[in-house]
From Swiss-Prot:
Keywords: Sporulation. It comes from the Bacteria. Residues 1-50 are annotated as: Disordered. Belongs to the SspP family. Disulfide bonds: none annotated. GO terms for biological process: asexual sporulation; sporulation resulting in formation of a cellular spore. Residues 33-50 have a biased composition (Basic residues). This is Small, acid-soluble spore protein P. Induction: Expressed only in the forespore compartment of sporulating cells. It holds the Pfam family SspP. The keyword RNA-binding does not apply. Its main location: other. It is found in: Spore core.
Length: 50
């Protein structure tokens, strides 16, 4: 067995990007209603799909 350099997946201390600090259970940004409104798109448009 020859000694090999550790690849990125086997590093002892991989340099991972740090996530923003947030208290447990707090959303990162925006409420559920806002997110739903943002992602609903054209579903609630009365003029869509005539």
């Amino acid at each position: 067995m020859s000694k090999r350099k550790m690849g990125p997946k086997q590093q002892k201390n991989p340099e991972l990007p740090k996530s923003p600090e947030q208290p447990y259970g707090e959303p990162l940004s925006g409420s559920k209603k806002e997110k739903k409104a943002n992602h609903s798109g054209q579903k609630h448009n009365p003029h869509h799909g005539l």
